[in-house]
Amino acid sequence: MKTGVRIKQHDITDCGAACLASISAHYGLNLPIAKIRQMASTDRKGTNVLGLIEAAGKLGFEVKAVKSKQPDGTNNVEPLQKIPTPAIAHVIKNEKLLHYEVIYSVKKDRIQIMDPGTGELEWIKIEDFNKEWTGILLRRDSEPICLTNNHGIVKSICFSLSHILFS
């Protein structure tokens, strides 16, 4: 597994697809953003959460969307330290632009994100992340296994470990 794969989105609507491309590459499955855009039904407005879940499923990832809000409307960042990473966070940039970022690591007071807008991997303070985070998170339910043939070409796109163990 590669750690923190940097992927830069091609245009403003590609952030969700770029995040999924980054996570796929993290597990050794390199796919073009254009292919993931198709899988996620990305349109001129971008990709919605359902589209990302469906595309992730087609890639063999079992994911679910969760929302973390406290009664006062603020995000509860404590569960972030318990989520399996990488995960995709829905954020609002500059108080107006809906965007997705990949969370690669969470420490006590810092979070490592890959922002497809810049294509960079960076550590930021959790309180700064919390200011932009909508509370929506796409997290995986199990470790995927990617199979490749002896030429390094994907023979069978990622299968979830639970499919193998419980089929």
Predicted regions and their residues:
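Cytosolic-side membrane-insertion boundary helix
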Residues: R139-S167
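Conserved active-site-adjacent core of cysteine acyl-enzyme catalytic domains
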Residues: M1-N130
